[in-house]
Swiss-Prot record:
The modification N6-acetyllysine is found at K33, K243, K288. It comes from the Eukaryota. The modification N-acetylalanine is found at A2. The lineage of its organism: Eukaryota, Metazoa, Chordata, Craniata, Vertebrata. The gene is NASP. Residues 116-139, 475-485 have a biased composition (Acidic residues). Residues 337-362 have a biased composition (Low complexity). InterPro entries: NASP-like (IPR051730), Tetratricopeptide_SHNi-TPR_dom (IPR019544), TPR-like_helical_dom_sf (IPR011990), TPR_rpt (IPR019734). Keywords: Acetylation, Cell cycle, Coiled coil, Cytoplasm, DNA replication, Isopeptide bond, Nucleus, Phosphoprotein, Protein transport, Repeat, TPR repeat, Transport, Ubl conjugation. Gene3D superfamilies: Tetratricopeptide repeat domain. The modification Phosphothreonine is found at T123, T170, T390, T464, T477, T490, T683. This is Nuclear autoantigenic sperm protein. Residues 604-659 form a coiled coil. The keyword Signal does not apply. One of its GO terms (molecular function) is histone binding.
């Protein structure tokens, strides 16, 4: 039972599978048929659309349509299939028309441009522009006046510019200096009253301290004066910021050497009025009767400079010197006005107890520092006001102190210095008042001498400037190198451009032109149509030959064009009637090809045959018009078209005949010139003239032939004797003569140079002998001619 159940199950499974197989539908070719029908219909539509564009003159659209149709049919049937012949033919025809359009042979090369619309737009634009003929005389005069006014304004502007340029730059500088001088006068006038009051107070205080110093005892040893300049209350700004500087307190302390007691302390406060400080202010040393005071306004951390004074000095000299100095300072500060200068610090310094300088006094200064010496009045003298930049000769405090060793002449020297300083200050004040606001701003440059620090800074500035110049030069050299690199790049660029141009040319060469592509398409269509034996296919092949001939004419291959037209004509004569218009067209194209190839006789013959075909066609159409009374409109229209073609063809015939005549004339002229050039060297007149010339030289007295020979001896070319023999020949002759002179037999072996020289002489002698022989032969020939 189990076996039977399994067998039935297997049979049932086989039946089910068979049913399933029968239910599966068989593959059908309906889809392929639909696709093929779609391709064929699409190709036909594209062909019709392309022909429509071709008739309408839209050549690029026609080319695209025919190209797509040919590609569809080529993919389906193959490129050499019969179904593709028509598409290839029309595609090649449209490409030919496109090439003609691009070359400017027929139509406008621009796509979709209508000449009529352009002309209309031009007329509209021209109407908007004013015409010179339409302008009245009044309008012209107004325009002229406007032009003249504009020209005059331009000339005036040029003159003013020239005048402004002609002004010297000093005017501008003076203006700026005037403004600066006015500002400085305002600042000085405000601060002039305060220093005077402060000076009075300081002098009173100094007198009190001097009296106390007199009462004090001096038990031991010399005094040591240390001048300390305290830190300024405010930091000194740069000259660019132009800020004022607060006053400095100078403390003068007298100490004992070797642990001795202090005799007294003198504090001298020097009030400086606010002033504009330059970048580097010099150290001002004021010296009076052995007192050395150093004011250092620039440094923020001033140092203590001790002054060693050796020995004691009588108190009387100190008192008298202090009193005289105080009086001089009061007279100067009270009796004169403050000059308007940039830097005019007024310093009043009095030492309460200062001893005169004796021999062996030592003053410690900063190493290498020069301090310009100013007079006691403390004011900037004439150079500071007038602008005279003659510097004051710097002297160190040591030199000043050594000069004042003799106590007797100290007062006289101080007075001699104070008197001219006062006179100079008075003169400077008067000059400053006369000058007014026109004081030059360059006064500050001559007011102070340059300290060594200034020199060091100047040297540093020069070094920095040199470095900057070197940097600039380096940048310039780098820039020049970059420019050279850029120039090299620009030089390399043309090479790259040349390569690009070459590559473009190669690409253009690789890209097939429209004429070449048209030739390929038409040739392929010709092959496809020629293998078909039907009349329609053969006529298409004839048309393919015709278009191939036109392509050859466009490419100026006239021989190939004649062959193509001739093959087209042969096919058309087989399948067409004698009065068909296609024959007339072929004859016309063939005549053009002959004319381009300078075969005017054949061209005239082909044009005349074309006229015959057209006349035959007109006769046939006239007969058809007579027969068909109602439907004669089409025939009449064709007759009119043919009549319009006849004058053009006749004109071509006349042109060919005229060119033939001109060609014949040119050919005759060319032949004549060639004949004249060939016979010009052998004219009979030349020989006669030479004979007559020789005959005229004959003697008339009947002399013998020997006399004739002697008469024509001038015709014989004589040997030319060299004027100066070469040094080589002289050396050779000397070399030959030397062995004979020395007693030799002359059979000495010559050297290599002598052998070469001998060979050269022999060659020259042979050439001369040949020339003489030729001359004698010519003379004999002339004698024979004269004898005859």
């Amino acid at each position: 039972m189990a076996m039977e159940s399994t067998a039935t199950a297997a049979v049932a499974a086989e039946l089910v599978s068979a049913d399933k197989i029968e239910d599966v539908p068989a593959p059908s070719t309906s889809a392929d048929k639909v696709e093929s029908l779609d391709v064929d219909s699409e190709a036909k539509k594209l062909l019709g659309l392309g022909q429509k564009h071709l008739v309408m003159g839209d050549i690029p659209a026609a080319v695209n349509a025919f190209q797509e149709a040919a590609s569809l049919l080529g993919k389906k049937y193959g490129e050499t299939a019969n179904e593709c012949g028509e598409a290839f033919f029309f595609y090649g025809k449209s490409l030919l028309e496109l090439a003609r359009m691009e070359n400017g042979v027929l139509g406008n090369a621009l796509e979709g441009v209508h000449v009529e619309e352009e002309e209309g737009e031009k007329t509209e634009d021209e109407s908007l522009v004013e015409n010179n003929d339409n302008i009245d005389e009044e309008a012209r005069e107004e325009l002229r006046e406007q032009v003249y006014d504009a020209m005059g304004e331009k000339e005036e502007a040029k003159k003013t510019e020239d005048k402004s340029l002609a002004k010297p730059e000093t005017d501008k500088e003076q203006d700026s200096e005037m403004e600066k001088g006015g500002r400085e006068d305002m600042d000085i006038s405000k601060s002039a009253e305060e220093p005077q009051e402060k000076v009075d107070l300081t002098l009173d205080w100094l007198t009190e301290t001097s009296e106390e110093a007199k009462g004090g005892a001096a038990p031991e040893g010399p005094n040591e004066a240390e001048v300390t300049s305290g830190k300024p209350e405010q930091e000194v700004p740069d000259a660019e910021e132009e800020k004022s500087v607060s006053g400095t307190d100078v403390q003068e302390e007298c100490r004992e050497k070797g642990g001795q007691e202090k005799q007294g302390e003198v504090i001298v406060s020097i009030e400086e009025k606010p002033k504009e400080v330059s970048e580097e202010q010099p150290v001002v040393t004021l010296e009076k009767q052995g007192t050395a005071v150093e004011v250092e306004a620039e440094s923020l951390d001033p140092t203590v400079k001790p002054v060693d004074v050796g020995g004691d000095e009588p108190e009387e000299k100190v008192v008298t010197s202090e009193n005289e100095a105080g009086k001089a300072v009061l007279e100067q500060l009270v009796g004169q006005e403050v000059p308007p200068a940039e830097e005019s610090p007024e310093v009043t310094t009095e030492a309460a107890e200062a001893s005169a300088v004796e021999a062996g006094s030592e003053v410690s200064e900063k190493p290498g520092q020069e301090a310009p010496v100013l007079p006691k009045d403390g004011a900037v003298n004439g150079p500071s006001v007038v602008g005279d930049q003659t510097p004051i000769e710097p002297q160190t405090s040591i030199e000043r102190l050594t000069e004042t060793k003799d106590g007797s002449g100290l007062e006289e020297k101080v007075r001699a210095k104070l008197v001219p300083s006062q006179e100079e200050t008075k003169l400077s004040v008067e000059e400053s008042e006369a000058a007014g606001d026109g004081v030059d701003t360059k006064v500050a440059q001559g007011a102070t001498e340059k300290s060594p620090e200034d020199k060091v800074q100047i040297a540093a500035n020069e070094e920095t400037q040199e470095r900057e110049e070197q940097m600039k030069e380096g940048e310039e050299t780098e820039g020049s190198e970059e420019d050279d690199k850029e120039n090299d790049k620009t030089e390399e660029m043309p090479n790259d451009s040349v390569l690009e141009n070459k590559s473009l040319q190669e690409n253009e060469e690789e890209e097939i032109g429209n004429l070449e592509l048209a030739w390929d398409m038409l040739d392929l269509a010709k092959i496809i149509f020629k293998r078909q034996e039907t009349k329609e296919a053969q006529l298409y092949a004839a048309q393919a030959h015709l278009k191939l001939g036109e392509v050859s004419v466009e490419s100026e291959n006239y021989v190939q064009a004649v062959e193509e037209f001739q093959s087209c004509l042969n096919l058309q004569e087989q399948y067409l009637e004698a009065h068909d218009r296609l024959l007339a067209e072929t004859h016309y194209q063939l005549g053009l090809a002959y004319g381009y190839n300078s075969q005017y006789d054949e061209a005239v013959a082909q044009f005349s045959k074309s006229i015959e075909v057209i006349e035959n066609r007109m006769a046939v159409l006239n007969e058809q018009v007579k027969e068909a009374e109602g439907s004669s409109a089409e025939y009449k229209k064709e007759i009119e078209e043919l009549k319009e073609l006849l004058p053009e063809i006749r004109e071509k015939i006349e042109d060919a005949k005229e060119s033939q005549r001109s060609g014949n004339v040119a050919e005759l002229a060319l032949k004549a010139t060639l004949v004249e050039s060939s016979t010009s060297g052998f004219t009979p007149g030349g020989g006669g003239s030479s004979v007559s010339m020789i005959a005229s030289r004959k003697p008339t007295d009947g002399a013998s032939s020997s006399n004739c020979v002697t008469d024509i001896s001038h015709l014989v070319r004589k040997k030319r004797k060299p004027e100066e023999e070469s040094p080589r020949k002289d050396d050779a002759k000397k070399a030959k003569q030397e062995p004979e002179v020395n007693g030799g037999s002359g059979d000495a072996v010559p050297s290599g140079n002598e052998v070469s020289e001998n060979m050269e002489e022999e060659a020259e002698n042979q050439a001369e002998s040949r020339a003489a022989v030729e001359g004698t032969v010519e003379a004999g020939a002339t004698v024979e001619s004269t004898a005859c």
